[in-house]
Regions:
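An aromatic- and histidine-rich active-site surface loop
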Residues: 14, 84-104, 108-117
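A short, charged, and often flexible helix/loop element on the N-terminal side
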Residues: 48-74, 123-126
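Membrane-proximal helix-turn-helix segments that form the acceptor-binding/catalytic region
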Residues: 72-76, 94, 98-102, 109, ...
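Carbohydrate-associated surface elements
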Residues: 151
């Protein structure tokens, strides 16, 4: 089975996703991590496949919108019936969810926080409302998910 995952962070330095990808690879999955070219193209030396989405926008909301738009079409192209989609956090859940419905393939949601409660959103009510709306509309529809928490 193939697993497609994505992160808007720098995939060269994202330790959480690197651990997940290494574990999945160890258990025999064909893993591909999709990332973004936020500050140029990182030199990637990973034992699993990687793919970078060209990012033009750097402002926060435009960056998320562009990444999710391009991620949707990337997932559509790469996913098939032998694919499991692994969404990491709320910031990329929408394209994963849509592709899982279109292709009728499983989606797993990895959430390590309640995204709409991030401290960086406390003084940004409009942005917080967008994330809260996505949380309320998508998370209850996810059949498979996991989280790691101290609580």
């Amino acid at each position: 089975l193939k697993i497609l995952s994505a992160v808007l962070n720098n995939i060269e330095t994202d330790q959480r996703l690197d651990k997940v990808c290494h574990s999945l690879l160890k258990f025999g999955y064909d893993i591909e991590l999709i990332g973004a070219t936020i500050n140029g193209r990182p030199k990637l030396n990973k034992p699993y496949k990687t793919f970078l989405i060209e990012q033009k926008n750097q402002s926060t909301m435009k960056k998320y919108a562009e990444f999710n738009y391009k991620l949707f079409f990337t997932l559509l192209k790469k996913a098939d019936k032998q694919t499991i989609l692994l969404a990491n956090d709320l910031d990329s859940l929408l394209p994963f969810y849509l592709v899982s419905k279109i292709k009728k393939i499983p989606l797993v949601f990895d959430s390590h926080e309640i995204y709409s409660e991030l401290p960086s959103l406390h003084n940004r009510p409009k942005t917080k409302k967008v994330w809260k709306t996505l949380e309320r509309s998508l998370v209850p529809k996810i059949k498979y998910f996991y989280t790691v928490s101290d609580g």
